[in-house]
Amino acid sequence: MPYRGSYHFAADGDPERPYAGMNIPNSLTILRILLIPVYIGLLVYERFDQALIVLLVAGITDALDGTIARAANQRTRLGAFLDPLADKLLLTSGFITLSSIHLIPSWVTIVVVSRDAMLLLGTAVAEFTESNIDIAPTFLGKGTTFLQLAYVLLVIFLSSHHMDLALLSPLLIGMMAFTVSSGLHYLYRGYRRAGSPAS
């Protein structure tokens, strides 16, 4: 079955190249996933400065894997799956852990995780049914990711310096507005595309 999308992917399902999917970009993505338990542990023990360093390293690997994949034409189906998964796991684990140590309100994390679960379910259904549903990122989706990351980073940074988290109230309001709006937009777009004939 051909991969849906506009990118040309390196063959990672070739039986003569069983490890073709394990290139440098994908290895960097896997490293990012492996850093998540370290990141969670540092947050739980409130070693916020070290947690920020781990986030910085994760961010560097995120930038490098995409750059290398494009420059060396090493984009694969495995990478297309793992890269957003790693980003989402990193963000979600941050929200859940920071809520567990009472630095982020639980309701915020519930909204964030519920939106992500809805998108994950929609993506899985689209792949399973081979539906004509466009799951490409939108402006709202990218804005949501940026604001969520900024919020988590600043919560950790302010906590490491014992500063008042109420300073982030305007950012929190904006982040939640984007989170809810993007979730509803993806839901609406998926509903419309699901009812349209396949192209």
Language-model segments: residues:
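Alpha-helical transmembrane bundles and membrane-interface segments of multipass inner-membrane proteins
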Residues: 2-199
